[in-house]
Amino acid sequence: MEGPAEWGPEAALGPEAVLRFLAERGGRALHAELVQHFRGALGGEPEQRARARAHFKELVNAVATVRVDPADGAKYVHLKKRFCEGPSEPSGDPPRIQVTAEPEAPDGPAGPEARDRLPDAAAPESLPGQGRELGEGEPPAPAHWPPLSAGARRKNSRRDVQPLPRTPAPGPSEDLELPPHGCEEADRGSSLVGATAQRPARQNLRDLVMGSSPQLKRSVCPGGSSPGSSSGGGRGRGGGDSDSASVASSSAEEESSGGGSVTLDPLEHAWMLSASDGKWDSLEGLLTCEPGLLVKRDFITGFTCLHWAAKHGRQELLAMLVNFANKHQLPVNIDARTSGGYTALHLAAMHGHVEVVKLLVGAYDADVDIRDYSGKKASQYLSRSIAEEIKNLVGALDEGDGESAAGSGGGRWRLSKVLPSHLITYKLSHALEDGGDHHHHHHSAEGWVGGKAKDPGRKASGSSSGRIKPRLNKIRFRTQIVHTTPSFRDPEQPLEGRGEEGVGEERPVKGHSPFTLRPKSNVFG
């Protein structure tokens, strides 16, 4: 008959032949190797070859599945697990098919292929029907399929919809043969753990110094500055005297440059916390260990220990720091500036610490005329509730109180508001010659100093205290006003009145005057 002759080459093709071929290779073989092995049964005429190939594909799909290894893109034919479990396979090594994963590890050349069959037998909970009828071009289900590796046999069960739960549970023989991506994730995880372990210390310090004020975050290290400083100081000195020398030598450079290095050693870190806390108990141990910390500036705010003491209003601490500097012969600048240009007197005036202001000006002769980078003196930060003696002490008499004195003098205008830019003022260095005729004018001119009225009673009270620094040179000078056109006088005023005053040579301004008219006063004559 024509049928047996036509199907003669396909007679050798059967489930047993394919099953035997895969079982001999551990349940897994290259697709090209399988096709090459049965190529003799797939030849013949084109029509016969097409039927033989279709028949061969059906046989392979009946007993195995085709998968692509993502590592190299090679196609592998895997034996289905029901054929791996059954003991009725015609040939091959039965123990090799039925044993578990542990005894299969030391097998010979067929060991890697046999291990690839075991996930199907060891994972019965996975769906057996998935990927069963795969063709040659069917996409792979698992994420990783390294060839001939022990990790691949566990990955075969990743035909399930949820591949991730099986990844973190490797078997005892998978510790040295993890897939490449798994290794990268593990390394990345370990590096992240290592980075987070090193980060808190530096970030803690940065949070302490980068806030609005370091004392707001003292809760990170409350009361523990002294123990930390002793241990940190011991560690810094253990490395040599270079650390201590660098702290002292960098103070002068930081004073001029305005900041130091962001990285602090433990001793400097403890100093920052103790200085911002403003307690002598914690500062004493650090200053004894390293006296140069007394004049060291914070690299963010530019504060020294003196600035912190003035800010907190602790005059006892301020006196102790100055005495400590004198005892150790340290040059201390009581007028040292912060990063914003503030002196200790500025900070004490800002926060209303009157006793600190008295100590700085009276005992340590702080300069009351220094202005910060905003152009303000310390007296301009005093609140209105501060006593008048304290304002006179810091030089507020000539700055802000002239307005109130002028306001009590019958509604006079301040010269700075009256005089326009084209009126020139001259300072006379000689005394007034005709004191009799111009006595009244002389007296009124002395009452104005730099455009502000002086209070005679305030002068007497200030001189009794001995703390005022009056500007005597301004008192000696007189102010001469040169009238130029246009004039301040009302253009509608009759000429007779102006003639009586002796200033008839001035001509009225025609039209509307661009300057504000002022009331008459004895200052201008």
Curated annotation (Swiss-Prot):
Q: Which residues carry this modification: Phosphoserine?
A: 88, 126, 213, 226
**InterPro entries linked to this entry:** Ankyrin_rpt (IPR002110), Ankyrin_rpt-contain_sf (IPR036770)
Biased composition regions of type Low complexity, renumbered to the chain? 101-112, 242-251
The residues bearing each ANK repeat, given as ranges, are 301-330, 340-370
Residue ranges with Gly residues bias: 230-241
Keyword line: ANK repeat, Phosphoprotein, Repeat
Cite the record's Basic residues compositional bias ranges: 468-477
Pfam families found in the cross-reference section: Ank_2
Q: Which SUPFAM superfamilies match?
A: Ankyrin repeat (SSF48403)
Q: Where is the signal peptide?
A: none
Which intervals carry biased composition (Basic and acidic residues)?
Answer: 489-509
List residues traversing the bilayer. Answer: none
Q: Which Gene3D superfamilies match?
A: Ankyrin repeat-containing domain
Region Disordered, as annotated, extends over 84-263, 434-525
Source organism superkingdom: Eukaryota
UniProt lists the family membership as follows:
Belongs to the SOWAH family.
The record ties this protein, via PANTHER family, to: ANKYRIN REPEAT DOMAIN-CONTAINING PROTEIN SOWAHC, SOSONDOWAH, ISOFORM G
What is the name listed in the Swiss-Prot or TrEMBL entry for this protein? Ankyrin repeat domain-containing protein SOWAHC
Originating species: Homo sapiens
Q: Which gene encodes it?
A: SOWAHC
